[in-house]
UniProtKB/Swiss-Prot annotation:
Transmembrane segments: none annotated. It comes from Arabidopsis thaliana (Mouse-ear cress). Residues 2-49 form the F-box domain. InterPro entries: F-box-like_dom_sf, F-box_dom, FBL60-like, LRR_dom_sf, LRR_FXL15/At3g58940/PEG3-like. This is F-box protein At4g22280. It comes from the Eukaryota. The lineage of its organism: Eukaryota, Viridiplantae, Streptophyta, Embryophyta, Tracheophyta.
Amino acid sequence: MDRINGLSDDIICHILSLLSFKEATSTSVLSMRWRYLFAFRPNLCLDDQEVGGGDSFIDFVDRVLVVTGNFPIRRISIKCRMSIDTGHVTRWMVDVLEHGVSYLDIDIISEDDIGFVPLEIFTCKTLVELKLARGFYAMVPDYVSLPSLKTLFLSSIWFCNRDCCPLGRLLSACPVLEELTIIGGCWQHIEFCRTVSSSTLKKLTITSSFHYEYWGITIDTPSLAYLEYSDLVPRHFPFVNLESLVEAKLALDLCSDSNPTNLIKGLRNVEVLELSSGYTSQILYDFREAIPVLSKLFRLSIKSNSRHYYIWNLLPILLEKSPKLETLVIKV
């Protein structure tokens, strides 16, 4: 213990950052010097499963953020599985932004209401990775600017803008964005086409976020290498640019007037393709005239369900369109 006490606070904080947060907080009983050192780790993971939920969790997070003072926080994760007031969550987010945080992960169940993402998040110059889950409303301002953001994860986020496509506005303010994940939520007001446009985006995942009233999705991502789309097909894809696509995983579903034609045409450069449901095989067969020559495809995986007979109708078409195919995996 004497040898450890001889180390500087910076080194001790680095050592504590290698422990779980529960283990790190247990060191606070060692001495007065150690009482708050756990709070000065550059990486903070505040989880109600480790420190208790409800009011005790709120008090604990408040205490940690007060103790850190002006000390920089590089990465912080706040997770709470017990419902808490959204006012606390908003206050915490604003607080950590003032610490120059680079990685922010918020996963909290709110009480009866859904909180708003604070406007300060949309002008944070230090954020590199942002993850928001469990439901927030968001109003993207016209002055949004996230110059350092590379990873954006949105789960059950409901955009409220009615004068524009808020996701399009948000992405246009992220000049170095590389990874985008959207799960559930609502992208935009009914009058606007969904737009995913980014010249830097390399990985895109869209899951269970479609609503019947939406008309179309524009995907303009010339640098995209990985696409995972597990959702309803909209009425149309007005524009699709997937020139650099290497791998695609599709689990498509149809409504009465869905049209995936341009999405299917956009797969022409894909090298690895996974069709993750029988409905996907059915959709590709129904729109088989849109299937391009897959000149680079070397691995094809097809999963099925009760609609497995569509696989055998679709398979000869895909084989004919894939001159360089090396591996075929069929899971029935």
